C-alpha cells in the first residue's frame, strides 16, 4: 500500500527521515500515526523509528534532547516541532510485567516491529508513503480485528497494560478482539493488578470516551479483566447497566467519572471521593465530580435546579451533570441550563458586595462564627434575588439577620 496524500504532520517531519537516510541509515514513521492515517483519523504524535543508534542520530542534528535515551529515544528539535526518534530495539526480561529488564539496539526493522503490541500498531511507513506491513496489520484493519503480534501471551507478559489497551482500542475503533488474543487476556487478566493505577486509569477513561464503548465493556466482561481494576471486582452488574444504556458518548473525563459514580451508586460526597481517590485522580477532578453528582441528583428528583444549586454547582460541573443526565434519560435543554446560570446575580462568593471587614466596620458583629453565618445568609439572599448585590442593601439585610440571631 502506498499513501499518496500524506497529512501535513508527515510532510513537516519528512526532513528528519531524509537526513537520517542520507547518512546511510533506515528511518520510518511507525505505530499509531500510521494506523490513524490509514483509518482517516486525526494524528496525535508522529513517531519515527530508525536503524541509527542514539549517538549516531545526535550527530546528524543540531538540536536534540535525550527524552529516553536508555530506551533509544531522542527528541529532534531541528525542524520546529519536536519529533521523537527511537532506535530499532529488542527487549527482554519483563519480571515486573511492566518494563523490560534489558533493551538491545538492533539494525533490523522486523525485530523492532515484532515486539509491538497489536498488528495494527506494527506498521511502518517510508517518507514517500509506502506502508510496510510485516504482520498482516492491514488485513486485520480491513476486517476490524485486533490481534496481538506473534504470541499474545508473550506480549501481555511484556506489559500487562496491553490487555487494557486491547479493550480500549475495541472501544475507540469498534474492532473485535481476535479469539486467541482474547483468550490470552482472560488467562492473564490477574497480571493487570501489577500495573500502576494511573496507567490503568488512562486506558479506562479512553475506553469510556471511545466511539464504541459497548465493544470495550464487552471485552472487559468476556475476559474478566474488570475484576482486576481498582474498585471494580464486584461491578459486573454496573458494567451491564452501562452496556444497556441507549447509544451514548462521553465527551470528557469529568462526565466519565460522573457517569461511573452514578452507575456505581456512589452518590454521596464521601463515596465519590473514596472512589476517585482509589483511582488516584486529581483533587480538581474529585471536586468537579462531587459537584456534578449533587446537581445530577437534583435533576433526577426535581427535574430542574434551584438558583442556589446552580450557584454552588458552577457552570462546568452543571454542563457535566446535564451531559450525564441526557445519557441517563433525564437531561435538560443545555442552552436553557447555561442561560439559567448566566442569569444569576453573582457567580462566585467573592463577588458579594460586602465582606467580614464591612460587618466589623458597621459594628454588626465581632469576629467569630456569627460573622460567617451572616455572610452566608447574605450570599443566599443575593443568589435567590431577595436582596440586590449592593453594599447598603446588604448591610441593612445583615443588620436584620444579626438582630434575629441576637433575640
From Swiss-Prot:
Classify the source by domain of life.
Bacteria
Task: Give the keywords, sorted.
Answer: ATP-binding, Magnesium, Metal-binding, Nucleotide-binding, Nucleotidyltransferase, RNA repair, RNA-binding, Transferase, tRNA processing
Q: What is its EC number?
A: 2.7.7.72
Q: Output the GO biological process annotations, alphabetical, semicolon-separated.
A: RNA repair; tRNA 3'-terminal CCA addition
Cofactor list: Mg(2+)
Q: Which Gene Ontology molecular-function terms are recorded?
A: ATP binding; CCA tRNA nucleotidyltransferase activity; magnesium ion binding; tRNA binding
Q: Which residues are noted in the entry as Mg(2+)-binding? A: 45, 47
UniProt cross-references to NCBIfam families, sorted A to Z = PRK13299.1
This chain's function reads: Catalyzes the addition and repair of the essential 3'-terminal CCA sequence in tRNAs without using a nucleic acid template. Adds these three nucleotides in the order of C, C, and A to the tRNA nucleotide-73, using CTP and ATP as substrates and producing inorganic pyrophosphate. tRNA 3'-terminal CCA addition is required both for tRNA processing and repair. Also involved in tRNA surveillance by mediating tandem CCA addition to generate a CCACCA at the 3' terminus of unstable tRNAs. While stable tRNAs receive only 3'-terminal CCA, unstable tRNAs are marked with CCACCA and rapidly degraded.
Q: How does it assemble?
A: Homodimer.
Matching entries from HAMAP family are given as: CCA_bact_type3
Q: What is this protein called?
A: CCA-adding enzyme
Organism in which the protein naturally occurs:
Lactiplantibacillus plantarum (strain ATCC BAA-793 / NCIMB 8826 / WCFS1) (Lactobacillus plantarum)
Source taxonomy: Bacteria, Bacillati, Bacillota, Bacilli, Lactobacillales
Amino acid at each position: 500500500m502506498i499513501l499518496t496524500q500524506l497529512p501535513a504532520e508527515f510532510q513537516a517531519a519528512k526532513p528528519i527521515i531524509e537526513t537520517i537516510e542520507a547518512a546511510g541509515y533506515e528511518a520510518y514513521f511507525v505505530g499509531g500515526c500510521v494506523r490513524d492515517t490509514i483509518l482517516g483519523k486525526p494524528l496525535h504524535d508522529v513517531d519515527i523509528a530508525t536503524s541509527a543508534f542514539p549517538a549516531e542520530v545526535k550527530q546528524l542534528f543540531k538540536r536534540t534532547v535525550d527524552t529516553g535515551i536508555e530506551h533509544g529515544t531522542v527528541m529532534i528539535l531541528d525542524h520546529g516541532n519536536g519529533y521523537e526518534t527511537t532506535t530499532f530495539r529488542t527487549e527482554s526480561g519483563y519480571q515486573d510485567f511492566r518494563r523490560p529488564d534489558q533493551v538491545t539496539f538492533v539494525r533490523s526493522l522486523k525485530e523492532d516491529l515484532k515486539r509491538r503490541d497489536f498488528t495494527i500498531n506494527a506498521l511502518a511507513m517510508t517518507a514517500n508513503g509506502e506502508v510496510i506491513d510485516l504482520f498482516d496489520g492491514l488485513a486485520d484493519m480491513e476486517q476490524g480485528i485486533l490481534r496481538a503480534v506473534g504470541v499474545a501471551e508473550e506480549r501481555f507478559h511484556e506489559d500487562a497494560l496491553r490487555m487494557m489497551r486491547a479493550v480500549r482500542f475495541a472501544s475507540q475503533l469498534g474492532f473485535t478482539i481476535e479469539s486467541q488474543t482474547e483468550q490470552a487476556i482472560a488467562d492473564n487478566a490477574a497480571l493487570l493488578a501489577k500495573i500502576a493505577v494511573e496507567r490503568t486509569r488512562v486506558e479506562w477513561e479512553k475506553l469510556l470516551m471511545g466511539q464504541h464503548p459497548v465493544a470495550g465493556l464487552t471485552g472487559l466482561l468476556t475476559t474478566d479483566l474488570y475484576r482486576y481494576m481498582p474498585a471494580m471486582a464486584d461491578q459486573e452488574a454496573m458494567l451491564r447497566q452501562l452496556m444497556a444504556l441507549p447509544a451514548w458518548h462521553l465527551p470528557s473525563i469529568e462526565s466519565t467519572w460522573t457517569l461511573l459514580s452514578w452507575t456505581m451508586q456512589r452518590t454521596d460526597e464521601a463515596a465519590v471521593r473514596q472512589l476517585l481517590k482509589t483511582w488516584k485522580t486529581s483533587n480538581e477532578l474529585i471536586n468537579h465530580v462531587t459537584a456534578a453528582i449533587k446537581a445530577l441528583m437534583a435533576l433526577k428528583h426535581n427535574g430542574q435546579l434551584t438558583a442556589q444549586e446552580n450557584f454552588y454547582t458552577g457552570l462546568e460541573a452543571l454542563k457535566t451533570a446535564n451531559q450525564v443526565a441526557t445519557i441517563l434519560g433525564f437531561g435538560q435543554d443545555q442552552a436553557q441550563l447555561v442561560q439559567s446560570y448566566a442569569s444569576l446575580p453573582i457567580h462566585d462568593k467573592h463577588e458579594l458586595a460586602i465582606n467580614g471587614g464591612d460587618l466589623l466596620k458597621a459594628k454588626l458583629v465581632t469576629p467569630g462564627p456569627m460573622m460567617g453565618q451572616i455572610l452566608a445568609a447574605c450570599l443566599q439572599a443575593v443568589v435567590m434575588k431577595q436582596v440586590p448585590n449592593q453594599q447598603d442593601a446588604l448591610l441593612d439585610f445583615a443588620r436584620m439577620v444579626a438582630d434575629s440571631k441576637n433575640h
